[in-house]
Design a protein with these regions (language model features):
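Short amphipathic alpha-helical coupling segments at ligand-binding clamshell hinges
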Residues: 97, 101, 168, 177-189, ...
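Short, catalytically relevant binding-site loops at active-site mouths
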Residues: 80-81, 119, 136-140, 158-163
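A ligand-binding cleft/hinge motif common to bilobed small-molecule-binding domains
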Residues: 2-7, 129-151
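A bilobed periplasmic-binding-protein/Venus flytrap-type ligand-binding module shared by bacterial periplasmic
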Residues: 44-51, 166-178, 197
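Extracytoplasmic ligand-binding site segments that recognize negatively charged/polar headgroups
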Residues: 1-128
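Periplasmic-binding protein-like
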Residues: 23-26, 41, 69-78, 102-106, 112-113, 188-212, ...
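An extracytoplasmic/periplasmic, membrane-proximal ligand-sensing/linker region
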Residues: 96, 204-252
Length: 252
């Protein structure tokens, strides 16, 4: 979403046809008609089940700075989804609060991993106690290694910034020379078979109207990124990346 918001803030996106936009609920496409969401990815805390149980985990992502979690939390600092999430964190709470939280996490010996999957795999084998990831990676790992993977997802309180639902957005450039093909691709992503694939095989939340999520996925009550102004998200993406780098988490 960050790069899409960045392109939108530069007036580089084209207008998507109403026949495509109408395939999703109103909150899952831009009011200006320049992007459309096709799947949802919830932010969660993945944890090692040998070390923790749900009742011992915090209500809020803010609580991860507590000394009892020192050295136990992994952060995918350079991952696009994390930077998107941190951009919304800044938008919702202000730069000072968001920066302080990240600095406190570093002071609490949070560990850097390059992406969501590496954190999920590390939590499953007990290398790290827990980490901030997209929900679907752990579902995929459990499906692939049901007998050996020892990690589960944990959701913070429903309205906590740590439970943000990130919409995966698709768009087209205003400068596109293949406008019709671009529209066809956007429509294809929202067809029932493709949406069913996203939820049945990759465990994402489908956004096309009428498509039922995988029964294994918990019902969504989380804060949604669709409620956040994509112009702000795009404009803040670079600043969020700068703050992440300045925090020192990438050297942990």
């Amino acid at each position: 979403p960050g790069p899409v918001g960045y392109l939108e803030s530069k007036d580089l996106l084209g207008q998507i046809g109403e026949d495509v936009l109408s395939l999703v609920d109103e909150q899952n496409h831009s009011a200006a008609g320049t992007w459309v969401g096709f799947s949802g990815r919830k932010r969660v805390l993945v944890y090692n089940t040998d070390e923790f149980s749900p009742e011992t985990l915090p209500d809020s992502v803010f609580d991860l700075t507590d000394p009892k979690y020192k050295g136990k939390v992994a952060i995918p600092g350079t991952n696009g989804s994390f930077v998107d999430w941190f951009t919304v964190f800044i938008d919702q709470y202000g730069e000072e609060t968001a920066t302080q939280w990240l600095n406190d996490m570093v002071d609490n010996d949070a560990k850097y991993y390059p992406n969501n999957r590496s954190i999920v795999e590390a939590a499953g084998r007990g290398e790290i106690s827990m980490g901030l990831v997209n929900h679907y990676y752990n579902y995929q790992e459990v499906a692939a290694n049901p007998d050996t993977h020892k990690a589960l997802n944990y959701s913070f309180n429903d309205n906590d910034i740590g439970s943000l639902l990130v919409i995966t957005a698709a768009t087209k450039l205003a400068s596109s020379e293949n406008d019709e093909a671009a529209e066809d691709l956007l429509a294809y992503l929202l067809t029932a078979p493709v949406q069913q694939y996203f939820t049945d095989r990759t465990f994402e939340y489908p956004l096309a109207a009428g498509v039922v999520p995988n029964a294994a996925l918990p019902a969504l009550t989380a804060l949604e990124i669709g409620s956040v102004d994509f112009d702000k998200l795009g404009g803040g993406f670079e600043e969020a990346s700068r703050i992440v780098e300045a925090s020192g988490i990438l050297n942990r």
